[in-house]
Amino acid sequence: MKHLIRTDDFTTQEIESILADAELFSDGRFDRILRDKIIITLFFENSTRTRSSFEIAAKRLGAEIVHLDVANSSTKKGETLVDTAMNLDAMGPHAIIVRHQNSGVAKILSNHTKASIINAGDGAHAHPTQALLDLFTLKKHFKNLEGKKIAIVGDIKNSRVANSNIELLSRFKMEVILVAPPQFLPQSDLRTTHYLEDIIDEVDAIMSLRTQTERHSSQTYASLKDYASDFCITSEVVGDRDIIILHPGPVHRNIDICDALLADKRCKVLEQVANGVAIRMAVLKKLIYDV
């Protein structure tokens, strides 16, 4: 059984196939090909977009969704996460979608299940379906990504979204530039800067990231407003440039992106959300139906 833990679990050819399926699904062309299939969602961290879009994706393809209420599960009685997964797997689901605050959990569980494990985010490690929907959004806008430049701005060091996008967008020949204060920059061979203004005239897209305060061991800024004074994506910074704006959500208004830009047609945040359903439909098809 194939799992999706990281974007590099799929070949480039497989990703192209997923994008093609997502294009059909986004146009409303799909059948209930997962009828009689069962998918379990196992979320140990809060989620609005990812969980909802996976559930909508599964239902549109005809699958049954079972959501395990983690707060009332046997993990609260001392059952290990691996034992929980093995017991759920014994019930015969076709996929288990997992989000967990610790990096590596999805990979560990994939070693103990017959069902496909789909990583819906593990700590600061990876969020593969987010990167796939971001790629889909960018390709719909630009068609050919080769040579295009994207600035990823914000708390990159603590972002699973950044990790997955760096791998995937680089594979599709985009130049990724990292923009962040020193404490938010990971060690990387990529081009980096502390000032968005330095590269604003070069980039074709900006991906803003939320400050991951829940993953900080100590306070890094006196306040989020102090952070925003340097790294909020504002109308003044972007001006009238032909740049599209992305964000994986949730957006901190006027911290990550200003209100005016969120209402601007160049902002693709809601398009990303819509594309997330189509991409997750395509991923479910790939892992459950196309085997």
From Swiss-Prot:
**Which GO terms of type biological process are on file?**
'de novo' pyrimidine nucleobase biosynthetic process; 'de novo' UMP biosynthetic process; amino acid metabolic process
Alphabetized, the UniProt keywords read: Pyrimidine biosynthesis, Transferase
EC numbers: 2.1.3.2
Listed InterPro entries: Asp/Orn_carbamoyltranf_P-bd, Asp/Orn_carbamoylTrfase, Asp/Orn_carbamoylTrfase_sf, Asp_carbamoyltransf, Asp_carbamoyltransf_Asp/Orn-bd
Reactions catalysed, as given in the entry: carbamoyl phosphate + L-aspartate = N-carbamoyl-L-aspartate + phosphate + H(+)
PANTHER family per the record? Answer: ASPARTATE CARBAMOYLTRANSFERASE, ORNITHINE CARBAMOYLTRANSFERASE, MITOCHONDRIAL
Q: How does it assemble?
A: Heterododecamer (2C3:3R2) of six catalytic PyrB chains organized as two trimers (C3), and six regulatory PyrI chains organized as three dimers (R2).
Q: What does this protein do?
A: Catalyzes the condensation of carbamoyl phosphate and aspartate to form carbamoyl aspartate and inorganic phosphate, the committed step in the de novo pyrimidine nucleotide biosynthesis pathway.
Q: What protein does this entry describe?
A: Aspartate carbamoyltransferase catalytic subunit
Q: What is the lineage of its organism?
A: Bacteria, Pseudomonadati, Campylobacterota, Epsilonproteobacteria, Campylobacterales
**Gene expressing this chain:** pyrB
